[in-house]
Amino acid sequence: MIGPISQINISGGLSEKETSSLISNEELKNIITQLETDISDGSWFHKNYSRMDVEVMPALVIQANNKYPEMNLNLVTSPLDLSIEIKNVIENGVRSSRFIINMGEGGIHFSVIDYKHINGKTSLILFEPANFNSMGPAMLAIRTKTAIERYQLPDCHFSMVEMDIQRSSSECGIFSFALAKKLYIERDSLLKIHEDNIKGILSDGENPLPHDKLDPYLPVTFYKHTQGKKRLNEYLNTNPQGVGTVVNKKNETIVNRFDNNKSIVDGKELSVSVHKKRIAEYKTLLKV
């Protein structure tokens, strides 16, 4: 069995042997087989994988930190713990870090926070893969904002932005994990959004930045797993240079990639890409 999330050391730095102890190979193989079956028979959109992602997330975070030590990825199981985690990275002189944050109190929603320390100032940007019209994202955002304000971190600038790329009900965890990795890989492209956050240009600090205002800040690679074609087209209308940009090792453009992962669900074109991403990430945890 996978250990309860609250009992796992999630700050990173565990060895491969310790990582493997979080989940048995046999259990993981069974999970992966079922995930692949769900994609094959088309039931993936109507399945709920939230609890599974909550349980596997600690192992994924440890694996990511072992592969990318400078990623500084942290898993925070409740917004109540976020401020002390941020304080720790500041005091340790960390200039850049990411926090995958869970709702806590038995909740299942995830978002991801990108942290940068620039000229003595702290910039925190919460990236919501869905939108803030839903209860889960709204509650997590409120709890996170309240926790940061309560701790009164010095010279700290916090904004919330919505990506609105998630359409299925239970993929916030794997979206947040994929975004965390992208925030690290594309870190040099994110300087402007953090500078604008510190200047107060990005948002007023009270209201989230809507997706159409966020789109100009982000490279097309952030939208690889966008589930809806309409949403992808909105991004490309704002960023036409992204249409011809190759986004992966298969030499696919973002539109090629969507078409190659397209599935018709309830009469709508939806991408199964993020579900395949979950399988790929779970497979990295398998031990020979």
UniProtKB/Swiss-Prot annotation:
Which molecular function terms from Gene Ontology are attached? O-acetyltransferase activity; toxin activity
Q: Name one GO cellular component term.
A: extracellular region
Notes on how activity is controlled: 1D-myo-inositol hexakisphosphate activates protein-acetyltransferase activity via an allosteric mechanism: 1D-myo-inositol hexakisphosphate-binding induces a conformational rearrangement that stimulates the interaction with acetyl-CoA.
Q: What is its main location?
A: secreted
Name the source's superkingdom. Answer: Bacteria
Q: Which residues bind CoA?
A: H109, R167, S168, Q227, G228, K229, K230, D266, G267, K268, E269, L270
Pfam families in the record = Acetyltransf_14 (PF03421)
The entry's keywords: Acyltransferase, Allosteric enzyme, Plasmid, Secreted, Transferase, Virulence
Q: Which residues form the active site?
A: H109, E128, C172
Which residues are noted in the entry as 1D-myo-inositol hexakisphosphate-binding?
K182, L183, Y184, I185, K224, H225, R257
- Indicate yes or no for the key word Transferase: yes
**UniProt cofactor(s):** 1D-myo-inositol hexakisphosphate
Q: What is its EC number?
A: 2.3.1.-
The enzyme's main class, written as a single word, is transferase
Q: Where in the cell is it found?
A: Secreted
Q: What does this protein do?
A: Serine/threonine-protein acetyltransferase translocated into infected cells, which inhibits the host immune response and induces cell death by mediating acetylation of target proteins. Inhibits the MAPK and NF-kappa-B signaling pathways by acetylating protein-kinases such as MAP2K1, MAP2K6, MAP3K7/TAK1 and I-kappa-B kinase (CHUK/IKKA and IKBKB) on serine and threonine residues critical for their activation by phosphorylation, thereby preventing protein-kinase activation.
In which family does this protein belong, per the annotation? Belongs to the acetyltransferase YopJ family.
Q: What is this protein called?
A: Serine/threonine-protein acetyltransferase YopJ
| Source organism of the structure | Yersinia pseudotuberculosis
Q: Which gene encodes it?
A: yopJ
